[in-house]
Every structure is written in C-alpha cells, then in structure tokens.
Design a protein with these regions (language model features):
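Glycine-aromatic micro-motifs
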Residues: 1-231
Length: 231
C-alpha cells in the first residue's frame, strides 16, 4: 500500500478459508512471467488457505487500487470472499468479514507460469514484515521461481524483450493515463488482450521451442514432458 501512496483506514491479518494463492496471471515471458491471484481450492490440492492483509479503504481509495491493477476491465476479476482475522482463528464463533479480492479472468494453467525472483521476494518480504505464521512463510519460501538456466534461454530472453517490451510497456502507460475511476477504456482493453495473446503465442510457438521456456524452469518442463509421455 505504501508504494501506491494509499492510507488504509484499518488493516488486519486475515485468512481466506477455501482459497489458495496462485500465479496464474500471465505477464511478460522471460522477465515477469506471472502475477499472483487467488482462487477456490480444487479437490486434491493441499496448498494452505491463503493469508493476507485485509484493508479498510474509502471508495475513492479502492477505485485507485483497482486502477493500479489495470482497472475493472483489466486482467483481474473482482470477487467477493469471506475472511477470518488470524487473531481469532482459534475462536469457532469468530465473525467472518466480507471482503473484495482479485482473481483472474483468463488464468494460464497446466502448468501455471512461475513468478520471478523479484516478484516473489515482494510477497515473501510482505509476509515477513506482517509477521505471518511461520508455517505459511515456510510455504512461501518453498514455492518455485522462474530461473534462466542456460545461455540459450538467456539469448531468447534478450531477443524476446527487444521485440515485445517496446510493444507491451506502453500499454501499461495508457492504462495509467486513461484508466480513471478504476475503469479502463474499452479500446485499451481491446488492445491489451490482443497484444498479450500475440505475445504469448509467439512465446509458445516460436521462442519456447527454440530457446527454452520463458514461463517455467527447464527442470519443470522436463518433468511435465515425462509425465505427459507416461500418461
């Protein structure tokens, strides 16, 4: 919140029962492959309930927050969830709090892309700063991050960014300039969707086969291919 220059009226540590942390929002391959969101836990998933900070914001501050995340028509989807204060988890009669949170409209899954070390350090740092439970901090510490493990992939990263960064980055500038009141103009959203689809198509069909993936590590890719061949 500090980096967005927002002043919440109140903050509490909270857990969202039945929801898990996911990195299923595609970003910029090779550089910032994924951003986080939350979604309901699927059957068989063992990830812990997501823990975070619940902020009490004014209507104006909330709209500013939405704008900073791409607006209502951006990649995020507003969802209504119920959370419990961490301090009251042992109290079965503790009241739940109704909150707004952000999920993703078009998740990239099977597999989900991995977050960068920079992005993951922000999440881990926030968990440490707010003194989240040690078990949850350990869970975050063990989540994998995207790494470039070969010179071939590094060459692919440089070439990919030379082509796509000058196209993608101005879109975020347009969102900041025209996304007033938490709403992004339709023509910017239209442009963003098509540019990102084209960018990820180029990654999946051209750059990844030639240079290695820009969203998962080579080790994870090998494991997925092995499982696929065995199935």
């Amino acid at each position: 919140m500090r980096r967005r220059k927002q002043q919440p009226l109140k903050t509490i540590q909270a857990v969202a029962p039945g929801y898990v942390l996911r990195f299923d929002i595609p970003g910029l391959p090779y550089q910032e492959p994924a951003f986080s969101s939350i979604r309901q836990r699927f059957s068989g998933e063992e990830d812990p309930d997501v823990i975070g900070i619940a902020y009490l914001l004014t209507g104006e501050e909330y709209e500013r927050l939405l704008q900073s995340e791409g607006g209502r028509d951006g990649g995020y989807l507003e969802i209504d969830i119920e959370v419990k204060p961490l301090a009251d988890l042992t109290n079965e009669n503790a009241e739940t709090i109704k909150c707004k949170s952000l999920s993703t409209k078009t998740p990239r899954e099977n597999p989900c892309p991995l977050p960068s070390a920079r992005y993951m350090s922000l999440i881990r740092g926030g968990a440490a700063e707010h003194k989240f439970p040690a078990e949850y901090q350990e869970y975050l510490a063990n989540l994998p991050i995207y790494t470039i493990s070969s010179w071939r992939t590094e060459i692919g990263r440089i070439l990919f960014l030379l082509v796509w960064a000058p196209i993608v980055l101005p879109i975020f500038g347009l969102q900041a300039a025209f996304g007033k009141g938490g709403k992004v103009p339709g023509w910017i959203r239209w442009l963003q969707i098509r540019v990102f689809k084209a960018m990820w198509f180029a990654h999946d069909k051209v750059f990844s086969p030639l240079f290695g993936p820009g969203d998962i590590t080579s080790e994870k890719e090998k494991l997925l291919r092995t499982v696929s061949k065995g199935s």
